[in-house]
């Protein structure tokens, strides 16, 4: 099975190199770009499965680079994935600093870099029309992850994302997936909805 994955990585990498070379000399169509983005996502999925494998110690880095290459082609889903990855690591580093055992200036600096990069990717995904990115950025603003905490601005982004998606009937599921199961969040969102109506 591992031999098959190695073969698949080589095959996809070869196709991506050919598409990149073609992009340098020609203006590719939308279908070609979509196909290249799909190859990046397929490669990222393979590397995600190979995390912590002794023959691929840098699989996680390769997965991130696959998403980064797809994001360079203006893919909203890739930007959203990168935003989630960087936000998760930044929150973990912030938690380490708050616990006090592993607090260092280098850790705080790296956490801030990750927060900045996460917000940049979430904003890029939001500009490309990704509803989940707008929602996650709203959650970041509500909780003060990498930015100054502002509940009003955060709730506005969450309400805008729900409006954009037209999913007012799915609010309980959306809140559960975001970790906003508290009644005060639900009442604040409903007040915002009444305010926009």
Predicted regions and their residues:
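Short helix-capping/linker turns of helical repeat alpha-solenoids
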Residues: 26-29, 35-36, 48-50, 55, ...
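Terminal, low-structured helical/coil segments at or just beyond the last alpha-helical repeat
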Residues: 165-197
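Small-residue (primarily alanine) positions within well-ordered alpha-helices
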Residues: 44, 70-71, 78, 118, ...
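TPR/TPR-like (Sel1-like) alpha-helical repeat modules
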Residues: 149-166
């Amino acid at each position: 099975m591992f031999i098959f994955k190695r073969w698949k990585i080589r095959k996809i990498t070869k196709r991506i190199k050919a598409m990149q070379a073609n992009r340098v000399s020609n203006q590719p169509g939308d279908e070609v770009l979509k196909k290249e983005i799909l190859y990046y996502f397929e490669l990222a999925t393979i590397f995600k499965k190979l995390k912590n494998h002794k023959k691929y110690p840098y699989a996680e880095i390769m997965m991130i680079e696959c998403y980064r290459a797809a994001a360079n082609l203006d893919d909203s889903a890739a930007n959203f994935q990168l935003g989630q990855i960087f936000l998760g690591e930044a929150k973990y580093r912030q938690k380490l600093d708050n616990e006090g055992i592993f607090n260092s200036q280098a850790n705080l600096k790296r956490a801030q870099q990750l927060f900045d990069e996460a917000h940049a990717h979430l904003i890029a995904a939001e500009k490309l029309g990704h509803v989940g990115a707008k929602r996650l950025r709203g959650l970041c603003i509500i909780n003060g992850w990498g930015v100054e905490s502002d509940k009003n601005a955060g709730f506005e982004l969450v309400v805008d994302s729900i409006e954009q998606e037209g999913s007012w009937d799915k609010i309980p599921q959306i809140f559960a997936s975001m970790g906003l199961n508290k009644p005060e969040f639900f009442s604040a969102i409903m007040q915002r909805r009444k305010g926009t109506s």
